Amino acid sequence: PGIRDYLGYGGHGILVFDMDHGHRFVKRIKTQGLHPNGKPSNVKGVAVSVALNSIYVSTLESLQRIDLTTEKVIWERQFVGGCDRMSISPDGKTMYLPSLEKNFWNVVDCETGDIIKKIDGFKRAHNTVYGSSGNSVYMGDIGNPWLYVSDTKTHQIRLKVGPFLGYVRPFTVNHNETLGFVTVDSLLGFEVGDLKTGKKLASLVVEGWNKGPVRRHGNPSHGIGLTPDEKEIWLCDGFNMRLHVFSAVAPYQQLTTIPMKDMPGWITFSLDGKFAYPSSGEVVDVQTRKVLLNLEDEFHNAVSSEKVVEIQFEKGKAVRAGDQFGVGRKK
């Protein structure tokens, strides 16, 4: 399920859409990831190892590795403390897998699923972004106002960024790993942190719109992404069912707003930067801000998902992959 364990947003499994042909529905890949009662569990994250030709799906209880050619589950591993939204190293070998809002992350071997190291000392582990250099991992603890940075050579925390105005929720980083764009509890807006010094640089509030109750996640702006060219920041607004667009260059001018059909709680982009994928199920043209279509499954049911990733194939194998997070890609 793309949102919690609700089957009304596209059902169970991995849904495949053809980006080159109008995002038409292609197929549904069968997955595991079940609650103890046998019903589909909440999907917490999705990530790809191009090197291993595998896609990984985390649920509340487990992590699955699925071969992208055979579309078969290679293994499913249960983890003590559960699983949350993970991230994989650029070489496709190592994963940082948060526990389910417990006090630790597991560093996991992507080939075997074995735990390499446990990193503890947190309150509620949740979101994870592996930096483009492969040297740092950015870790969001939703019980702390800090964004944590781990050194991947030692798997030890080497920096805290913040403190921010509230507990850190979804965030993103630029390609050069100098800036972090962070959403926090209670703020309809985002904050900016310096990933080298650890200092908070800016706090931005959405102008012209009021906060209100949201059905999921509890914070007003659950979802933020950088366009791949790093020119813009797209911010989710659940209550007002909007995407707010900002310049990604200080002073981060608010540019426009785009209405959605449901409460967006996540956003990512295509690798080429042409398409935005909010979790409410629309495909948005980044340049024109127009909603091009709404994703539908094989039964013509509306599809919504907070776990979306682009994969490019050649001769049946993955050659390039995007990210569930809308991370910067400007080199």
What label would you give each PLM region?
Residues 1-331:
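Predominantly soluble domains enriched in secretory-pathway, periplasmic, or organellar proteins
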